[in-house]
Amino acid sequence: MQDIKAIIPAKDKWVSIVWQVNDWCNFRCTYCSEWNWAGRNRNDHDIPLIVDTLEKIMLHYKDKGYEYFKLYLSGGEPTFWKALIPVVEKFREHAKWPGSCVGINTNFSKPLSWWKENHHLFEDIVASYHAEWSKDDKYIEVYKFLQDKKNYLCSRIMMHHDHFQQCVDFGNRIREECDNYMIEYAPVYDELRPSTDPYHYNEQWQMDFFKTNSTVQQQSIPVQKDPSYAWAKTWFEDDTIEPINTNSIITEGKNFFQGWLCNIHESLHIHPNGRIQQASCGVGPIVGNIVQGEFNTTLSDGVWCPKSHCHCAADFNISKARPEYAEKIR
């Protein structure tokens, strides 16, 4: 990958809401911190207040001229969250369609019947595969059902160092059994916490695997897609502009944006305890708490990034530029 000049909107300015809806998960992966699954903040109470606060947030941005939104839900495991359906329905009521997007990061542990009933609520689905817990047959069954129905359907295989070959084999199974697929072979970050470093694989063959196997994809049958403008493009050194590939940015070590202008006011990260913060990196201020019904409409402008590296793929999508190209995103 070439060096990056800037990351820019696909079309018009848009707002990203990245929401870790709770900290409860039915999986207990050894590489995952207890803070992601223990259930200290399940957020299953006072759902109407949560929905009303989301509405307040969206109306604020709409008053500022924003029409397109992307809601990206993770956990924990968000498909088990009691507020999931009412939250997504309220979001869809206020976002502009076509053009906006609801995405979800799930472990595919819900049955096929659930996905048949609710898949219409989501444009993008990232299905993480966890070698210690995922049920391979069930995962494949759901993936095959969704393969021609989503704008974006990605199998994100978490490359556990002790189950590395199992992960490789499962990726091969998807490629053999599915007509359409996108597979990301994802290096595991130690404890999956923002402050930690990437996991360093001890065996050379595992390190070598990532050099040639970042992302693979195929489309053999038509996909029902609606236009989406809530995404980003990468502007490269040679002036080519391509859709952003967040996994490649990580695996090729391009996630270093210190000193760049970053429009963190166009991104909200909602933590499991309800805290609303501009971006997920910790640089932006806290602007409310969604489970307490609080939102401060006085948001900061873009910042010159002080961090050595950007740890969260969702933050890669925020408009950002090297100083000499900052005017392109103001």
Located regions from the model:
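Short loop/turn motifs at secondary-structure junctions and domain boundaries
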Residues: 62-63, 258-262, 278
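Canonical Radical SAM [4Fe-4S] cluster-binding loop centered on the CxxxCxxC motif
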Residues: 6-52, 280
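Radical SAM/AdoMet-radical enzyme domain recognition
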Residues: 54-73, 81-184
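Residue-level signal for mature regions of secreted extracellular proteins and peptides
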Residues: 18, 22-25, 71, 255, ...
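Flexible mid-to-C-terminal extensions adjoining Fe-S/redox cofactors in radical SAM and related proteins
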Residues: 1-13, 35, 271-330
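Short catalytic/ligand-binding loop motif for oxyanion handling, primarily in non-cytosolic enzymes
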Residues: 38-41, 80-82, 112-113, 163-165, ...
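Glycine-rich short-loop/terminal segments
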Residues: 24, 33, 57-59, 68, ...
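Radical SAM enzyme [4Fe-4S]-AdoMet core and its adjacent flexible, acidic
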Residues: 124, 128-267, 272-273
